């Protein structure tokens, strides 16, 4: 069957993030940085509250398939502190920025997307955002690649998180292709499960030496290998 669309996960697939997948140990440093920047007085009890709310929405600790907005999360955080809700947007921005330092787009990402695009194959993304991270931040990380991407899409847009196949199903409708005519490329088990749940061809990008068997149709070490798969 001819491949008509390729969908990419973002983190650790198109973009390298040097931070751990579980941010829990960095909650306090992130908010200490925010407090220092804005001269806020956050008490120990408030730091505990902040950590508890963030842990509640940490999908590495508490997986969920229904997405939750950033405003919901940060309203809950600030409501348990002395910080005015007027700071909500500023604190969201600084919190997300704390975790987005030193990111790097993988060196073969642009050339791979360009080659796929030259074959008249549609390109999209499907990424689970962290803590409801707004698309204005999440998609900023792939800004140099956006010229190749027909539909930049995240769990914010879908309303669902992986391994639910709903996001891929929505993308297939938007692209007017069958899910079976799509390839989904990701680096985690949930990416492969998402593809399987949607009836999409799955490609695991595995840059480690460790063998990973998640039920994927294909496994690659570098993005440029994808070109040979789509034919």
Regions found by a protein language model. Give the residues of each.
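N-terminal helical cap/lid subdomain that shapes the substrate entry/recognition surface
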Residues: 2-106
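Asp-based, Mg2+/Mn2+-dependent phosphohydrolase catalytic module
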Residues: 1-6, 17-18, 36, 41-45, ...
């Amino acid at each position: 069957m001819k491949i008509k669309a390729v969908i990419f996960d973002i983190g650790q697939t198109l973009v390298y993030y040097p931070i751990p997948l579980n941010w829990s140990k960095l909650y306090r440093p992130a908010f200490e940085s925010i407090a220092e920047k804005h001269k806020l007085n956050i008490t120990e009890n408030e730091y505990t509250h902040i950590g508890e709310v963030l842990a509640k929405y940490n999908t590495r600790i508490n997986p969920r398939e229904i997405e939750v907005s950033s405003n919901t999360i940060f309203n809950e955080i600030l409501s348990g502190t002395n910080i005015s809700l007027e700071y909500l947007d500023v604190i969201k921005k600084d919190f997300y920025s704390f975790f987005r330092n030193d990111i790097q787009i993988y060196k073969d990402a642009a050339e791979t997307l360009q080659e796929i695009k030259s074959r008249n194959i549609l390109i999209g993304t499907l990424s689970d955002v962290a803590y409801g991270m707004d698309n204005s931040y999440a998609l900023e990380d792939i800004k140099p690649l956006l010229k190749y991407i027909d539909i930049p899409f995240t769990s914010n847009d879908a309303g669902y998180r992986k391994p639910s196949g709903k996001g891929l199903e929505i993308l297939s409708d938007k692209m007017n292709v069958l899910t079976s005519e799509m390839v989904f490329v990701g680096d985690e088990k949930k990416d492969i499960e998402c593809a399987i749940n949607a009836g999409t061809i799955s490609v695991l990008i595995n840059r480690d030496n460790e063998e990973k068997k998640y039920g994927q149709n294909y496994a690659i070490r570098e993005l440029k290998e994808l070109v040979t798969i789509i034919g």
